Amino acid sequence: MADSTAGAKKRKKRSTSATSTRKEPPTVIPEDECTTCSICQSKLVMFSGVSKYKLSDYLNTGKVFTNSNIRCKACGSSLCHLRDLSKS
């Protein structure tokens, strides 16, 4: 009788270390690089950190977005127009 594996190619086994997934460290923004308000120097929320904060608290008060402007909640100064965000 013929061997059942006759003519079959041998499969190479891959090492488990080569197929393991690499985890990259999370992106951390240093404290010095945070955007601040030009008037009161309070730190502003970065768009990458929006998911960490409850935006509904800020949107319900109406102090952040007023007349298509983004305003600083601490001092009320106008930061930029919403239409300018798409250009940057």
UniProtKB/Swiss-Prot annotation:
Top-level taxon in the UniProt lineage: Viruses
Pfam family, one: DUF678
Family from the record: Belongs to the chordopoxvirinae A19 family.
Region (Disordered): 1-28
Organism: Fowlpox virus (strain NVSL) (FPV)
InterPro entries attached to this UniProt entry: Poxvirus_A19
Name this polypeptide is given: Protein A19 homolog
